[in-house]
Amino acid sequence: DGVIRMDGVLYVLEIKASTQQSTLINLGEKFPEPFVLEQWNEEYYAQAMTYCKFAEIENHLLICSDAGGRKLHIVRTPYNATYADALMLKAERIADAKEPPNKVGGRNFWKCKLCSFYGICYEP
C-alpha cells in the first residue's frame, strides 16, 4: 500500500488478496467503476475514503488478486469527501459519547469475538 502516480494521476494505492475477487469483477460489469468498491465491500470503501482524506489525494486505486495471487483486477474510485467527513463525525460522536454505542452482535458473533474490546462488552 502507498501512493502511486499512474497516467499522470495520483492515487492512494491498496493491494488486497480476496476469495471474493470474482464478485468484484462481476460488480464491475454491473456498475460504473466509481461505484464498484462501495458495492463490493463497504468496509474497504470506508477505509479507502479515509486514506484519501488524510493523504489529501483525490483518487483511490485497488489492485485485488484472487486468493492464489494469479489473477489481478484493478478498481479506480474517486474520493468521496462527503462520505469521509460523515465517517469522521461518526467516530467523533463515538469517541465523545458518555455511553458506549449499542453492540453490533452478541457474545458469540464472530466479529465481536475478533474485536479488541470484546472483554469490555462481554466480560463481567
Residue ranges of predicted features:
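Conserved catalytic cores of phosphodiester-cleaving nucleases, focusing on short active-site segments
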Residues: D1-F35, Y51
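Metal-dependent nuclease catalytic regions and adjoining charged, substrate-binding loops involved
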Residues: I25-L27, F35-Y45, T50-P124
